[in-house]
Swiss-Prot record:
Protein name per UniProt: Large ribosomal subunit protein uL11
Modification comment: One or more lysine residues are methylated.
NCBIfam families membership: L11_bact
Provenance organism: Gloeothece citriformis (strain PCC 7424)
Keywords: Methylation, Ribonucleoprotein, Ribosomal protein, RNA-binding, rRNA-binding
Amino acid sequence: MAKKIVAIIKLALPAGKANPAPPVGPALGQHGVNIMAFCKEYNGKTSDQVGMVIPVEISVFEDRSFTFVLKTPPASVLIRKAAGVERGSNEPNKKNVGSITQDQLREIAQTKMPDLNANDIEAAMKIVAGTARNMGISVKD
């Protein structure tokens, strides 16, 4: 029989740098999960993506064991990296802070495809382009 899930915890952590300090410690500790075991496993699986923020969904079971699923980095992080800017515009409709090309947009959409609710790459590109526009980053042809 399958183990019963007690909680699902969603966190966005820097790749390869999870440690027992907040936010990881308190989130897992209240469910009785072995925090160090999670940190070691997470850091091991994300060590090749250092510098990115990787969302993770942790399922905690009745016997305090856990499994986790890594998601793709947030679109905003990928867009900022592609545009080479530190942060998005504070007035997105008035002031542009950078731009990305169609090729970069397609690459980001392909990376995000598993987590996006889109049927094809064109729809995914529109979703990512909308995110970029809301950050004050234009998409060049």
